[in-house]
Amino acid sequence: MPIITIYQGASGEGQELAETVAQGLGYHCVGREVLVEASRRYRIPEAKLNEIVEKGPHWWERLLQDLRPYRVALQAALCELADDGKVVYHGHLGHELLPGIGHVLKVLLTAPIEFRIEQVRSRQNLADAAARHYIEEVDKARSRRLMAMFGTDWRDPNRFDLILNMSRMRREGATRVIIEAAKLEEYQPTAASEQVFNDLALGSRVHATLLASPDVQGSALEVRAEGGHVYVKGRIDQGSEDEVLNLVKNVPGVIKVTSDLYSVPPDAFFGP
Protein backbone atom coordinates (compact mmCIF):
# COMPACT_ATOMS: atom_id res chain seq x y z
CA MET A 1 0.00 0.00 0.00
CA PRO A 2 1.21 3.55 -0.68
CA ILE A 3 2.22 6.42 1.54
CA ILE A 4 -0.62 8.98 1.44
CA THR A 5 -0.31 12.76 1.65
CA ILE A 6 -3.38 14.96 2.05
CA TYR A 7 -3.25 18.70 1.39
CA GLN A 8 -6.01 21.15 2.14
CA GLY A 9 -6.06 24.93 2.20
CA ALA A 10 -7.16 27.09 5.11
CA SER A 11 -10.48 25.38 5.75
CA GLY A 12 -12.16 22.07 6.16
CA GLU A 13 -11.40 18.82 7.89
CA GLY A 14 -8.13 17.66 6.37
CA GLN A 15 -6.78 16.34 9.66
CA GLU A 16 -10.01 14.55 10.54
CA LEU A 17 -10.14 12.95 7.08
CA ALA A 18 -6.50 11.87 7.33
CA GLU A 19 -7.18 10.27 10.71
CA THR A 20 -10.22 8.42 9.34
CA VAL A 21 -8.25 7.16 6.32
CA ALA A 22 -5.38 6.06 8.55
CA GLN A 23 -7.77 4.18 10.83
CA GLY A 24 -9.37 2.45 7.85
CA LEU A 25 -6.01 1.30 6.49
CA GLY A 26 -4.33 0.50 9.80
CA TYR A 27 -1.83 3.31 9.18
CA HIS A 28 -0.54 5.98 11.53
CA CYS A 29 -1.46 9.59 10.89
CA VAL A 30 1.19 12.32 11.11
CA GLY A 31 1.17 16.07 10.71
CA ARG A 32 2.88 18.26 13.25
CA GLU A 33 4.95 15.24 14.30
CA VAL A 34 7.17 15.95 11.29
CA LEU A 35 8.09 19.35 12.77
CA VAL A 36 8.77 17.82 16.18
CA GLU A 37 10.98 15.09 14.69
CA ALA A 38 12.92 17.54 12.53
CA SER A 39 13.43 19.87 15.49
CA ARG A 40 14.60 17.07 17.77
CA ARG A 41 17.00 15.45 15.34
CA TYR A 42 18.50 18.44 13.57
CA ARG A 43 18.74 21.17 16.22
CA ILE A 44 16.21 23.53 14.69
CA PRO A 45 13.87 25.29 17.14
CA GLU A 46 10.34 24.00 16.67
CA ALA A 47 9.02 27.57 16.72
CA LYS A 48 11.29 28.45 13.78
CA LEU A 49 10.15 25.41 11.80
CA ASN A 50 6.54 26.30 12.49
CA GLU A 51 7.18 29.84 11.25
CA ILE A 52 8.87 28.52 8.11
CA VAL A 53 5.97 26.16 7.36
CA GLU A 54 3.02 28.36 8.26
CA LYS A 55 4.05 31.87 7.21
CA GLY A 56 4.90 33.08 3.74
CA PRO A 57 8.28 34.81 3.39
CA HIS A 58 8.54 38.49 2.61
CA TRP A 59 10.47 39.41 -0.52
CA TRP A 60 13.64 40.23 1.44
CA GLU A 61 13.51 36.86 3.20
CA ARG A 62 13.41 35.10 -0.15
CA LEU A 63 16.63 36.90 -1.05
CA LEU A 64 18.48 36.60 2.25
CA GLN A 65 17.32 33.40 3.91
CA ASP A 66 18.57 29.97 2.92
CA LEU A 67 15.62 27.61 3.28
CA ARG A 68 17.63 24.46 2.49
CA PRO A 69 18.27 23.45 6.13
CA TYR A 70 14.56 23.55 6.90
CA ARG A 71 13.48 21.80 3.71
CA VAL A 72 16.05 19.03 4.10
CA ALA A 73 15.33 18.55 7.81
CA LEU A 74 11.59 18.24 7.17
CA GLN A 75 12.23 15.82 4.31
CA ALA A 76 14.50 13.65 6.45
CA ALA A 77 11.98 13.67 9.30
CA LEU A 78 9.06 12.68 7.07
CA CYS A 79 11.11 9.87 5.51
CA GLU A 80 11.93 8.63 9.01
CA LEU A 81 8.27 8.65 10.05
CA ALA A 82 7.20 6.99 6.77
CA ASP A 83 9.90 4.32 6.84
CA ASP A 84 7.42 1.45 7.16
CA GLY A 85 5.24 2.91 4.39
CA LYS A 86 2.10 2.98 6.55
CA VAL A 87 1.61 6.72 6.88
CA VAL A 88 -1.08 9.26 6.10
CA TYR A 89 0.43 12.75 6.24
CA HIS A 90 -1.83 15.79 6.51
CA GLY A 91 -0.30 19.18 5.88
CA HIS A 92 0.79 21.42 3.05
CA LEU A 93 4.36 20.21 2.40
CA GLY A 94 4.13 16.43 2.23
CA HIS A 95 3.34 16.19 -1.47
CA GLU A 96 6.59 18.05 -2.24
CA LEU A 97 8.81 16.37 0.38
CA LEU A 98 8.62 12.94 -1.28
CA PRO A 99 9.42 13.59 -4.96
CA GLY A 100 9.81 10.85 -7.54
CA ILE A 101 8.47 8.01 -5.37
CA GLY A 102 5.95 5.85 -7.20
CA HIS A 103 4.16 4.52 -4.11
CA VAL A 104 2.99 7.92 -2.84
CA LEU A 105 -0.66 8.86 -3.35
CA LYS A 106 -0.93 12.66 -3.27
CA VAL A 107 -4.41 13.96 -2.48
CA LEU A 108 -5.67 17.54 -2.79
CA LEU A 109 -8.88 18.56 -1.03
CA THR A 110 -10.59 21.51 -2.66
CA ALA A 111 -13.93 23.34 -2.60
CA PRO A 112 -15.54 26.56 -3.88
CA ILE A 113 -14.67 29.66 -1.88
CA GLU A 114 -18.23 29.98 -0.52
CA PHE A 115 -18.04 26.48 0.97
CA ARG A 116 -14.63 27.20 2.49
CA ILE A 117 -15.89 30.47 3.99
CA GLU A 118 -18.75 28.64 5.67
CA GLN A 119 -16.38 26.04 7.12
CA VAL A 120 -13.97 28.64 8.50
CA ARG A 121 -16.83 30.81 9.75
CA SER A 122 -18.39 27.97 11.72
CA ARG A 123 -15.11 26.55 13.00
CA GLN A 124 -13.59 29.84 14.12
CA ASN A 125 -16.74 31.85 14.83
CA LEU A 126 -15.85 34.53 12.27
CA ALA A 127 -17.98 36.84 10.17
CA ASP A 128 -18.10 36.09 6.43
CA ALA A 129 -15.73 38.93 5.54
CA ALA A 130 -13.22 37.91 8.21
CA ALA A 131 -13.38 34.26 7.12
CA ARG A 132 -12.77 35.23 3.49
CA HIS A 133 -9.82 37.42 4.48
CA TYR A 134 -8.36 34.61 6.60
CA ILE A 135 -8.60 32.11 3.74
CA GLU A 136 -7.06 34.51 1.23
CA GLU A 137 -4.16 35.41 3.52
CA VAL A 138 -3.35 31.82 4.47
CA ASP A 139 -3.55 30.66 0.85
CA LYS A 140 -1.21 33.45 -0.26
CA ALA A 141 1.25 32.75 2.56
CA ARG A 142 1.37 29.03 1.78
CA SER A 143 1.73 29.71 -1.94
CA ARG A 144 4.72 31.96 -1.28
CA ARG A 145 6.28 29.44 1.06
CA LEU A 146 5.93 26.51 -1.35
CA MET A 147 7.32 28.61 -4.18
CA ALA A 148 10.27 29.70 -2.03
CA MET A 149 11.05 26.19 -0.77
CA PHE A 150 10.28 24.06 -3.82
CA GLY A 151 9.63 26.37 -6.76
CA THR A 152 6.13 24.89 -7.13
CA ASP A 153 2.52 26.08 -6.92
CA TRP A 154 0.06 24.01 -4.87
CA ARG A 155 -2.72 25.14 -7.21
CA ASP A 156 -1.13 23.15 -10.06
CA PRO A 157 -3.32 20.02 -10.37
CA ASN A 158 -0.44 18.11 -11.93
CA ARG A 159 1.25 18.04 -8.51
CA PHE A 160 -1.43 15.63 -7.23
CA ASP A 161 -2.83 12.20 -8.07
CA LEU A 162 -6.34 12.65 -6.68
CA ILE A 163 -8.38 15.85 -6.29
CA LEU A 164 -11.58 15.77 -4.25
CA ASN A 165 -14.21 18.51 -4.17
CA MET A 166 -15.26 18.42 -0.52
CA SER A 167 -18.40 20.43 -1.18
CA ARG A 168 -19.71 17.42 -3.09
CA MET A 169 -19.07 14.62 -0.59
CA ARG A 170 -19.00 13.90 3.10
CA ARG A 171 -15.96 12.72 4.99
CA GLU A 172 -17.13 9.10 4.79
CA GLY A 173 -17.32 9.26 0.99
CA ALA A 174 -13.92 10.92 0.68
CA THR A 175 -12.46 8.26 2.97
CA ARG A 176 -13.81 5.48 0.75
CA VAL A 177 -12.47 7.12 -2.42
CA ILE A 178 -8.97 7.56 -0.97
CA ILE A 179 -8.83 4.03 0.43
CA GLU A 180 -9.96 2.54 -2.89
CA ALA A 181 -7.41 4.65 -4.78
CA ALA A 182 -4.72 3.43 -2.40
CA LYS A 183 -5.49 -0.14 -3.49
CA LEU A 184 -4.78 0.55 -7.16
CA GLU A 185 -1.86 -1.33 -8.65
CA GLU A 186 -0.28 1.91 -9.89
CA TYR A 187 0.41 3.06 -6.32
CA GLN A 188 1.74 -0.17 -4.83
CA PRO A 189 5.39 -0.29 -3.73
CA THR A 190 7.83 -1.98 -6.07
CA ALA A 191 11.47 -2.85 -5.57
CA ALA A 192 12.38 0.16 -7.70
CA SER A 193 10.11 2.64 -5.89
CA GLU A 194 11.28 1.41 -2.49
CA GLN A 195 14.88 1.91 -3.58
CA VAL A 196 14.07 5.49 -4.63
CA PHE A 197 12.51 6.08 -1.20
CA ASN A 198 15.49 4.55 0.62
CA ASP A 199 17.92 6.67 -1.40
CA LEU A 200 15.91 9.82 -0.71
CA ALA A 201 15.71 8.97 2.99
CA LEU A 202 19.44 8.34 3.35
CA GLY A 203 20.45 11.32 1.21
CA SER A 204 18.22 13.71 3.13
CA ARG A 205 19.35 12.28 6.46
CA VAL A 206 23.01 12.81 5.54
CA HIS A 207 22.33 16.29 4.15
CA ALA A 208 20.33 17.32 7.24
CA THR A 209 23.09 16.02 9.52
CA LEU A 210 25.68 18.09 7.66
CA LEU A 211 23.57 21.25 7.68
CA ALA A 212 22.92 20.83 11.42
CA SER A 213 26.65 20.79 12.20
CA PRO A 214 28.05 24.20 13.27
CA ASP A 215 31.27 23.37 11.41
CA VAL A 216 29.47 22.77 8.10
CA GLN A 217 26.50 25.15 8.12
CA GLY A 218 28.15 27.69 5.84
CA SER A 219 29.08 25.13 3.21
CA ALA A 220 27.33 24.78 -0.16
CA LEU A 221 26.89 21.04 -0.55
CA GLU A 222 24.96 18.66 -2.77
CA VAL A 223 24.20 15.20 -1.44
CA ARG A 224 22.69 12.13 -3.06
CA ALA A 225 22.58 8.45 -2.17
CA GLU A 226 22.41 5.29 -4.25
CA GLY A 227 22.06 2.01 -2.43
CA GLY A 228 24.07 3.10 0.60
CA HIS A 229 26.71 4.86 -1.51
CA VAL A 230 26.65 8.57 -0.66
CA TYR A 231 28.01 11.23 -2.99
CA VAL A 232 28.91 14.62 -1.52
CA LYS A 233 30.17 17.55 -3.54
CA GLY A 234 30.48 21.30 -3.23
CA ARG A 235 32.27 24.10 -1.44
CA ILE A 236 33.34 23.76 2.19
CA ASP A 237 35.27 25.91 4.63
CA GLN A 238 39.01 25.46 4.44
CA GLY A 239 40.19 22.62 6.66
CA SER A 240 36.74 21.09 7.23
CA GLU A 241 36.91 18.17 4.78
CA ASP A 242 37.70 15.58 7.45
CA GLU A 243 34.81 16.83 9.58
CA VAL A 244 32.42 16.57 6.63
CA LEU A 245 33.49 13.05 5.73
CA ASN A 246 33.35 11.84 9.34
CA LEU A 247 29.83 13.18 9.73
CA VAL A 248 28.72 11.40 6.56
CA LYS A 249 30.34 8.08 7.49
CA ASN A 250 28.68 8.07 10.91
CA VAL A 251 25.13 8.33 9.55
CA PRO A 252 23.40 4.92 9.84
CA GLY A 253 22.98 3.26 6.46
CA VAL A 254 26.04 4.78 4.80
CA ILE A 255 28.21 2.08 3.23
CA LYS A 256 30.54 4.09 1.02
CA VAL A 257 31.33 7.78 0.52
CA THR A 258 32.55 9.52 -2.63
CA SER A 259 33.42 13.19 -2.26
CA ASP A 260 34.15 16.04 -4.64
CA LEU A 261 34.87 18.90 -2.24
CA TYR A 262 36.79 22.12 -2.62
CA SER A 263 37.54 25.10 -0.41
CA VAL A 264 38.50 28.70 -1.04
CA PRO A 265 41.06 30.40 1.23
CA PRO A 266 39.56 33.31 3.20
CA ASP A 267 41.93 35.84 1.58
CA ALA A 268 41.09 34.72 -1.97
CA PHE A 269 38.39 37.38 -2.27
CA PHE A 270 40.57 40.30 -1.20
CA GLY A 271 43.50 40.07 -3.59
CA PRO A 272 47.12 41.03 -2.86
Per-range role (PLM):
Residues 35-89, 126:
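ATP-dependent small-molecule kinase phosphotransfer cores
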